[in-house]
Design a protein with these regions (language model features):
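Flanking helices and flexible, charged tails adjoining ferredoxin-like Fe-S electron-transfer domains
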Residues: 5-12, 54-163, 330, 335-371
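Conserved nucleotide-cofactor-binding alpha/beta core module
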Residues: 143-168, 173-192
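Local cysteine-cluster metal-coordination motifs and their immediate loop/turn environment
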Residues: 20-35, 57-69, 172-178, 267-279
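Short, flexible loop segments at boundaries between secondary-structure elements
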Residues: 191-212
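Gly/Ser/Thr-rich loops at beta-strand to alpha-helix junctions
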Residues: 96-99, 122, 169-179, 199-201
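Immediate flanking context of iron-sulfur cluster ligation sites
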Residues: 14-22, 53-57, 164-167, 254-269, ...
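Long, compositionally biased charged/polar accessory segments in the mid-to-C-terminal portions
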Residues: 111-114, 214, 219-415
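Iron-sulfur cluster-binding cysteine motifs and their immediate structural context
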Residues: 12-16, 27-50, 60-78, 284-285
Length: 415
C-alpha cells in the first residue's frame, strides 16, 4: 500500500496507491520514534504523510499504527440507542443538535479530566484543542465541517493517559480509530466519542472561504457556526461573525462553502469509501442528529434540537447514567434511529461527478467563482433564502420543510 518515492528536495513522500486509503488521521506521524513523518497538504489542501528517509529507521511503527492497514473488526459489548437533549436552554441553542457533547464533556471536566475536540486557532483554522474548563469548551460546541488538524495531540493524550488523567476525545470516526490504533489498546481512563460523519472538506478550501468572506465584508472573521439555529434546528444556517460587528447568515442553498459540502463536492477522497461506517464502532458513544423525533417518539418536536446517540460500551453507559440529571433522555430502538435519522451511519455519500474539477478551480479562484462553474447558486435559491425569515416568524417554515422532505442524500453502500 505504501510506496516511497524520491523527491527533488532529498526527502521521501509516503504515497498511497489510492487516496481512498488515507484518512489523514496522523496515527503514522504520531507513532514515528524519530519524528521522520510530517503531515503536508496536497493540491486540494488535505493532509497526507511525508517521510524523511534520512531520519527513518524502517521500524514499521507507522504501518502498525495505520487504522486502515490494520482495521479491526469491532464487536460492541451491546449497542443501545437513545434520544437525548441537554436541559440547559442556552447550551441547547448554541449546540448543533441536542447538546450531547457538552453534557458528556462537562461531566469529564467535573472529574478533573481533560477534553479534546475541534475548535479554532487565531487564524480561524480548525484544529484539535484541549479544554480543562467549561469556558474552553464553548468553541468546541457545534459542528465544524472541516477536517481538523490534530497536530501532535495523540502524543499529548498518550502522556496524559499514562499519568492517570481521565480524557474525553471527540472526533470523526477515522480520528477515533486512528487514536486507538496509535495507542494499541483502549485505556480505562479514555472516553472516545465519535459522530456520524457525512465527510470532511479540506482545510485548504476552508482557508479559501475565510479569505473570500473577509474580503467581501472587509473585516476579520471572529466566529463561525456551521449549523446555527437562527431559524430553528430543522432549518439551520451558517453564521459568521466579523470583527466590525457585522453578522452573516447563509444556508446550504446560498453559502458557497455549505453548498459545496451538501452537494458532496468538497469531502476528502477517502470519505467516499469510509472504512469506519457501521453501527458497531470502536468509540464508547456515537452522536448524531435526530431530525425525526416526532416520527420515532410520537411526541411534538419543538424545533430546538435533539441528539441521537449510540452507547457501545459499559463505560459509555455508566457516564450516560451519571449525566441523567442534566439531560432529557429516552431509550429507542437502534435500528429505528438508523432508519429515520442515520442514512450516513452505514453508508458513504456518493461524491459529485465534477468534484476533481471543482478543486482544480478552487486553486485559482475564490470559492464562490469556483462553485458557480459547477453548481451555480440560482435566483430561486436566493428567493427561498430571503423568504426564510418571514416563514420562520409565521410558522410556515415547518410546512415548507415538510414539502422539501423528499430529497435524500445519494449514498454508496459500505460492504
Amino acid at each position: 500500500l505504501l510506496l516511497l518515492n524520491d523527491l527533488d528536495s532529498g526527502g521521501y513522500m509516503i504515497q498511497i496507491k489510492s487516496k481512498l486509503d488515507c484518512c489523514g488521521c496522523t496515527a503514522c506521524a504520531s507513532s514515528c520514534p524519530k519524528s521522520a513523518i510530517t503531515m503536508v497538504p496536497d493540491e486540494e489542501g488535505f493532509l497526507y504523510p511525508k517521510i524523511d528517509m534520512r531520519r527513518c529507521i524502517e521500524c514499521g511503527a507507522c504501518e502498525r499504527a495505520c487504522p486502515i492497514l490494520n482495521k479491526k473488526t469491532v464487536i460492541s459489548e451491546k449497542t443501545e440507542g437513545y434520544i437525548i437533549r441537554i436541559k440547559d436552554n442556552k447550551i441547547l441553542y448554541e449546540s448543533t443538535s441536542g447538546g450531547a457533547f457538552t453534557a458528556l464533556a462537562d461531566y469529564i471536566l467535573e472529574q478533573n479530566g481533560i477534553v479534546y475536540g475541534a475548535g479554532y486557532d487565531n487564524n480561524m483554522r480548525v484544529v484539535c484543542k484541549r479544554a480543562t474548563t467549561k469556558q474552553q469548551l464553548q468553541e468546541m460546541r457545534g459542528s465544524k465541517f472541516v477536517q481538523s488538524d490534530l497536530g501532535n495531540i495523540f502524543q499529548d493524550i498518550k502522556k496524559e493517559l499514562k499519568e492517570g488523567t481521565t480524557i474525553l476525545f471527540s472526533g470523526t470516526p477515522c480520528q477515533v480509530a486512528g487514536l486507538l490504533s496509535f495507542l494499541r489498546k483502549k485505556p480505562d481512563n479514555l472516553l472516545c466519542v465519535d459522530f456520524v460523519c457525512r465527510g470532511v472538506p479540506s482545510p485548504g478550501l476552508w482557508d479559501n472561504y475565510v479569505k473570500y468572506m473577509e474580503n467581501k465584508y472587509s473585516s476579520k472573521i471572529v466566529g463561525a457556526r456551521f449549523k446555527h439555529k437562527t431559524y430553528g434546528y430543522h432549518t439551520s444556517t451558517m453564521k459568521i461573525d466579523f470583527a466590525n460587528g457585522k453578522t452573516y447568515y447563509g444556508s446550504g442553498r446560498v453559502d458557497p462553502y455549505m453548498k459545496a459540502f451538501v452537494r458532496e463536492i468538497s469531502s476528502r477522497p477517502s470519505c467516499a469509501a469510509c472504512a469506519f461506517k457501521g453501527i458497531e464502532r470502536p468509540s464508547d458513544i456515537t452522536v448524531f442528529d435526530c431530525y425525526e423525533y416526532s416520527k420515532i417518539t410520537g411526541r411534538k418536536d419543538d424545533n430546538r434540537g435533539y441528539s441521537s446517540i449510540f452507547v457501545h460500551t459499559e463505560k459509555g453507559g455508566k457516564i450516560l447514567e451519571a449525566i441523567k440529571s442534566h439531560i432529557e433522555i429516552q431509550e429507542e430502538d437502534v435500528n429505528s434511529l438508523v432508519t429515520e435519522n442515520g442514512v450516513m451511519v452505514c453508508n458513504s455519500a456518493k461524491p459529485h461527478p465534477r468534484r476533481a474539477e471543482f478543486y482544480l478551480l478552487a486553486e485559482h479562484y475564490p470559492i464562490d467563482e469556483a462553485l458557480n462553474k459547477i453548481e451555480p447558486i440560482t435566483l430561486k435559491d436566493k428567493i427561498i433564502e430571503k423568504s426564510k425569515r418571514f416563514l420562520f416568524k409565521t410558522g410556515l417554515i415547518t410546512v415548507a420543510r415538510h414539502l422539501n422532505k423528499g430529497k435524500k442524500v445519494e449514498v454508496v453502500e459500505n460492504k
